[in-house]
Amino acid sequence: MLVIKNARVFTAAGRNYDKGDIAVENGKIVAVTESIEAKDSYDVIDASGLFAMPGIVDAHSHIGGFAGYDQDLNEMTCNATPSMESFYAIDVTTKDFQRAKRAGITTSVIAPGSGNVVGGLVCAVKSAGSSLEDMCIKNPSMHGSD
């Protein structure tokens, strides 16, 4: 169990704490409250003077798609490229993903560029992970459109 103590906590439910604690178990938040008694076996982070809030979802991003000279997210071979899949243009080794995590962005919906009228299919990815396959949350071309 990980306990983050003494942070200024903002929750998605609107319940905020000037000085609050967060309990995390197996990578999931299990409690947010004014005070959590931390047992000796718990890992504890003192977040005094720091903020804690839900991760930000960037609903329109080109992160990792314009990393080099390729400009793979901007497919401009014709006016409409509806079958262009942003998944195959994303480079997760760029520093963009590290910057996103530091900024609090935990999920990005990566879209093709605006080089044409219909750019293609988006892909939702986590900011953390070791490979695009691990980071991908939703890729319509691979998982259907549900």
Predicted regions and their residues:
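Metal-coordinating catalytic core of metallo-dependent amide/deamination hydrolases
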Residues: 124-146
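Histidine-rich, glycine-flanked metal-binding segment
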Residues: 9-53
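Metal-associated gating/positioning segment near the N- to mid-region
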Residues: 50-117
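Short low-complexity, flexible loop/linker segments enriched in glycine and/or proline
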Residues: 45, 117-118, 122-127
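Short beta-strand scaffold segments in enzyme catalytic cores
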Residues: 21-23, 109, 122-124
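Detector for glycine-centered tight turns/loop "hinges" at secondary-structure junctions
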Residues: 14, 115-116, 131
